[in-house]
Each structure stands twice: as C-alpha cells, then as structure tokens.
A protein has these predicted regions:
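Conserved N-terminal beta1-alpha1 strand-loop-helix module at the mouth
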Residues: 105, 135-194
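Conserved Nudix-box catalytic region and its N-terminal flanking loop in Nudix hydrolases
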Residues: 4, 28-68, 80
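NUDIX/MutT-family hydrolases
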Residues: 95-97, 105-138
Length: 194
C-alpha cells in the first residue's frame, strides 16, 4: 500500500519574488523565457526572481533585473502584490512597473527576450502566475477612490468632472454608509459623465 501525503496550500513553502513589468514608450512589455537548467525552463514570464536573504522587494528587483537583463531601472513603481500556488510551492509576487531604465535589455543568462503587446502576448507557454498581471495591466494606471460622505454631491461632481478631464478612467465610489436610494442618486450622474 502506497502512502499518499496530502498537503494543504497554506503548508507549502512561500517564496517571495520580485517581478518587473518593463514597458516601452510604445506600450510593449518585455517578456523573458526561463533559461535552460532552471525550473520551468522554456516557459515565458515577466522578468524577476527570488529575494535573497535580507533583501527588500526593491533590492531584489534591481539585482534580478541587472543580472538577467543588464539594465538598471531609473524608477520602479510598486504596483501589485499577490500570492499564487503551484503544486509544490506558493509564490508571493511583488510586481513593479518600470517605464525608464539605463542600458539595453538582453538575455544575460542565455534566455530569449521579447517585446510583446500586452493585449496579444504571442510567446508561450506562459508561467501561470503571470496571468493575473496580464489581466491587471489592462486597467488604467491611475485609480481614484472617493469618499462621498465628506462632501456635497455638487462639489463631488465638480471634482469628478475635473478628474475625467485629466484622463482618469477608473473610479471606486466608497458606499459603506449609503442606502440603495443614495447609491442610485450618486451613480446615475457618474455613469452619464463617463
């Protein structure tokens, strides 16, 4: 009789990973193939790698991007963080957006790299943990949270019009203290404005 060990996802080791979404001026994102000899070699991903002992997410990102691609980010913007479970481990991805860097990206570990349209990634297979990034990258960079209970509706709409004029396209209206009638009263003008 064979012993089968069933592990719960929460019991799997958690690996912290710094990930870079490097975006060119024309909107393309840089994808890198996992090099031969590494786990999941041949799969494509956003560049990055595991934290070393004592490193912050920013330090791990800068080190990994330089080691893998030979570039130094001028600024890396913390963007999203999430966990993903593989059969043998869990990863926590600390994802950064990079729009400016020094150097020319190249596969310094023998890996192929490719500039891809984030709406139509051609390289495959992709590591599954990267799918969430591809969903979120379609959202606008600027996300406004509102608190309507602290202002009048007229003032709120004036501010909202200015934000729309400045290019804001994603707004979350905090409605914790609103009844359905108040919610309808505030959302109708917002929908018309959009």
């Amino acid at each position: 009789m064979q012993n089968i060990i069933i592990r719960k996802k929460k019991d799997l080791p958690l690996v912290n990973v710094a990930v870079a979404v490097i975006q060119s001026e024309d909107g393309y994102v840089l994808m890198a193939e996992r090099p031969y000899g590494k786990e999941s070699s041949g799969s494509w991903e956003f560049p990055g790698g595991k934290f070393e002992l004592g490193e912050s997410a920013e330090q791990a990102l800068a080190r990994e991007i330089y080691e893998e691609l030979g570039i130094k980010p001028k600024m890396a913007y913390p963007w999203i963080s999430y966990k993903f479970a593989y059969p043998n481990k869990r990863v926590k991805l600390h994802v950064f957006r990079i729009f400016n860097w020094e150097g020319t990206p190249s596969g310094r570990e023998g890996q192929r790299i490719s500039w891809e349209d984030s709406d139509a990634i051609r390289v495959s297979p992709l590591l599954p943990a990267n799918n969430h990034i591809l969903e979120v990258i379609k959202l606008p960079l600027l996300y406004i949270l509102t608190n309507t209970s602290q202002s009048s509706m007229v003032k709120f709409m004036e501010v909202l019009v200015k934000l729309f004029e400045q290019g804001v396209r994603l707004i979350q209206v905090c409605t914790r203290h609103m009844n359905p009638e108040q919610l309808t009263q505030i959302t109708r003008p917002i929908v018309k404005l959009a």
